[in-house]
A protein has these predicted regions:
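Class I S-adenosyl-L-methionine-dependent methyltransferase catalytic core
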Residues: 1-117
Length: 117
């Protein structure tokens, strides 16, 4: 049985052992690559560029949705935390998370599973 999974804020796909799993649609608002100060490569390479607050998927499309949105509202412009995890807008973060949660529930099938991390 094919299980359709959406990672709505995949970032560098740290959540996954198999970063090429064909069952997972990796989505993020950005595509980004950088070398961190300790020499590690940071690569954000989603399948789909998209905004978790306004997803372009049909209702009830996924069996499992992973929602691990950015959780920082303050960070320096060159902060590795901001580069790795992204930033929420200081003025709208509560509304952004609420809209994202609602979108995740919309694209999740009835009786599906939401992982809110």
């Amino acid at each position: 049985m094919l299980v359709k999974i959406l990672d709505a804020c995949c970032g560098s796909k740290m959540f996954y052992f198999d970063k090429t799993n064909p069952n997972v649609t990796f989505m993020d608002i950005r595509r980004y690559s950088d070398i961190l100060c300790d020499g590690r490569k940071l690569e954000i390479k989603p399948d789909i560029i998209g905004d978790f607050r306004n997803m372009q998927f049909s209702n009830d499309e996924f069996d499992l949705v992973v929602f691990d949105p950015p959780h920082l509202i303050k960070a320096g412009k060159n902060s590795w935390l901001a580069k790795k995890y992204g930033l929420l807008d200081f003025a709208s973060w509560q509304d952004d998370l609420s809209r994202g949660f609602n979108e995740c529930m919309r694209v999740l099938k009835p009786c599906g599973t939401l992982i809110f991390k």
